[in-house]
A protein has these predicted regions:
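Primary recognition of N-terminal secretory signal peptides and signal-anchoring hydrophobic helices
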Residues: 1-115
């Protein structure tokens, strides 16, 4: 999968899942590879994300993302928690941090046809 941030393009092996008919990217896996920090607190129902000088808190119980500046963005279906790991839609990742991802480069093995 290719990831672009501020003109730099990275070719990364990212963990993804499919949920709600869409692809979601493991934030922990992505941030480890590009220098961000992700902290998920299941008890507090919050996810702290730090990258590129930006800090967002995803308040899962309230359904909003809050920036240090106080800006709020509704989460909608942008975040999925699976086995205590946080996955975010590529569109939401772009909205929060300006990170563009190309999920079309993800290899998907087609099922054999039964003709």
């Amino acid at each position: 999968m290719t990831v672009e941030y501020q003109g730099q393009v990275y070719s990364l092996d990212l963990l993804t899942i499919k949920a709600n008919g869409s692809d979601y990217i493991s934030v922990e896996n992505l941030f480890k590879q590009i220098g961000g920090v992700e902290y998920y607190s299941p008890i507090m129902k919050k996810v702290n994300l730090f990258f590129g000088g930006k800090n967002w808190v995803l308040s899962l119980d309230k359904g909003i993302a809050v920036a240090e500046s106080g800006e709020e963005i509704p989460l909608g279906r942008s975040v999925v928690i699976q086995e205590n790991s946080v996955y975010i839609s590529p569109q939401f990742l772009n909205q929060l941090f300006g990170i563009s991802t190309d999920t079309s480069s993800t290899v998907v093995t087609p099922s054999p046809s039964t003709t």
